[in-house]
Amino acid sequence: MQLRRATMDDALDVLSWRNDETTRMNSFTQDEISQENHLKWFKKKLDDENCLMYILEDKNVKAGSIRVDITDEVGEISYMIAPGERGKGLGKAIIEQLEGISEIAGNDSKCQIRCLVGFVNEANIASSKCFKSNGYTELIAGDIKCYIKNI
């Protein structure tokens, strides 16, 4: 299992995962996203120097994606697991692997991330468990849970 940087070749897989009913149910934005809008957004994220986007591959199969948007030394995590790959512990693994990447862990001089955060809908129990099992501190505000970890 490994993380690699995302490319435009991954855009349609990520769109398919994002528009999956279960993914949408657990997302803050639950509407389906059009291919046209997604491709524009995906390219913009790939070109953004304050965004790091990765694909998780397990036995040469694309199994999920994880993105970190960096603002003022804080990296906000957003991830999803491909529908056919859920239930295999990959949510915990994708976060754990992200923390070991040199761009995130601080071994890359361009990266100044001091803290990672993830926001989770209260109903998304699986994602909450993934953050907790990776040592994140949970804060709750209404129906949103925030998970924080200094790195």
Where are these regions (language model features)?
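Acyl-donor (CoA/ACP) binding surface of acyl/acetyltransferases
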Residues: 2, 6-11, 57-151
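Residues within well-ordered alpha-helical secondary structure of globular protein domains
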Residues: 16-20, 44, 133
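A short, well-structured alpha-helix characteristic of acyl/acetyltransferase catalytic modules
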Residues: 4-32
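Flexible, glycine- and charge-enriched loops at secondary-structure boundaries
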Residues: 31, 35, 88
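Residue-level signal for alpha-helix termini/capping positions
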Residues: 19, 46-47, 103, 107
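A short helix-loop-beta-strand connector motif used in the catalytic cores of GNAT acetyltransferases and
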Residues: 43-55
